[in-house]
Amino acid sequence: METASKRPKSGAAKKPAAAKARGDGPSYLDGQLLIAMPVMEDERFARSVIYICAHSSEGAMGIIVNRPAGSIDFPELLVQLDIVEKPEQIKLPDHAESMKVLRGGPVETGRGFVLHSSDFFIKDATLPIDDGICLTATVDILKAIAGGTGPKHAILALGYAGWAPGQLENEIQENGWLHCDADADLIFGDDIEEKYDRALHKLGIEPGMLSAEAGHA
């Protein structure tokens, strides 16, 4: 699996939540949210909330859901990807016009990844993850959204975050990340700037308290 060129660094802080177990095997985090600790040294992941799409003994892959990709919007991206030739050719439903383009991570930043609700599915292209959330990374879903036949809820990210085998587990043990159950309202919500605090609140943690405790084992 492709991984970021630099590993997220972390310091000592509160222990992460319990991971999901698969029978008697290892615990993996598919379908959960990673929440960066305040001591995260890698600016690419500072205050990031990452939805884990795949996690196994071979590594992990996730999408940052709270980092805008600059000022680019969905219609502009459709033109850049040559899905349409001119902006005036785009006729988007309201939910697509307001869809945020996010910076999903430092790997394959020129490629688009769409997290979306399970009411849309492309055979051999859509990956069901957990709790009605799926991942599709083909231009077909962008065309469907642009034409009003796409999923009800979606976010589009450029790039993804990747970890080598055992890397994510080590970072969690080093207290670089907290994790919690995901929910669609948080992932697909428009309040990008509030997602980090909302994720901490799911664990019953006040952001200010966490910052004060960071660095104290």
From Swiss-Prot:
Biased composition (Low complexity): 10-20
GO cellular component assignments: cytosol
Pfam family, one: DUF179
InterPro entries given in the database record: AlgH-like
Stretch list, region Disordered: 1-24
Family: Belongs to the UPF0301 (AlgH) family.
UniProt protein name: UPF0301 protein RPA0913
